[in-house]
Amino acid sequence: METVRLTIDNKTLEVPKGTTILEAAKSIGIHIPSLCYMKLEELHYENNPGACRICVVEIEGRRNLAPSCKQECTEGMVVYTHTPRVINARKTVMELLLSNHPAECLTCSSNGHCELQNLAHSLGIRQIRYKGEMSEFEIDRSPSIVRLSLIHI
């Protein structure tokens, strides 16, 4: 199996070729926040790897930030996961996501164990700078849609 050697936050490691930066960082205990796996239908947001941009990292020699969930590790790559530039980008992305999110956290069934809420808190977001009209989406009331609020377990 072919491997590549890289450095993440001053820790050198070797990973199989094709490993993403997110996977490599996780393998050495470095947490990079990501929302790729979250179900964000209530935001009307299709959450595919690389779409949310919360997991961006700085790669030495590149001008732009890269989504760690999509960027494969390359030989000699040097990655920084928590620089001021990275943190500011994550805050901006999170504020943009939250600006179109219903502000009903206190009455939400996920309150207290919501990854979105926890990430906003860890990034120090107390208010949203981006104001404006929220997106409006037609509610699908067809009989084939299962309404979770109607299911009692």
What are these regions (language model features)?
Residues 1-9:
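Eukaryote-biased recognition of intrinsically disordered, low-complexity regulatory segments
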Residues 11-12, 106:
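A generic secondary-structure micro-motif detector
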Residues 53-150:
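Fe-S ferredoxin-like electron-transfer domains
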Residues 13-75:
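N-terminal cofactor/phosphate-binding cores enriched in small/glycine residues
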Residues 2-3, 47, 71, 133:
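A generic structural signal for ordered alpha-helices
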Residues 9-11, 148-149:
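Extended, non-catalytic structural segments that build the interaction scaffolds
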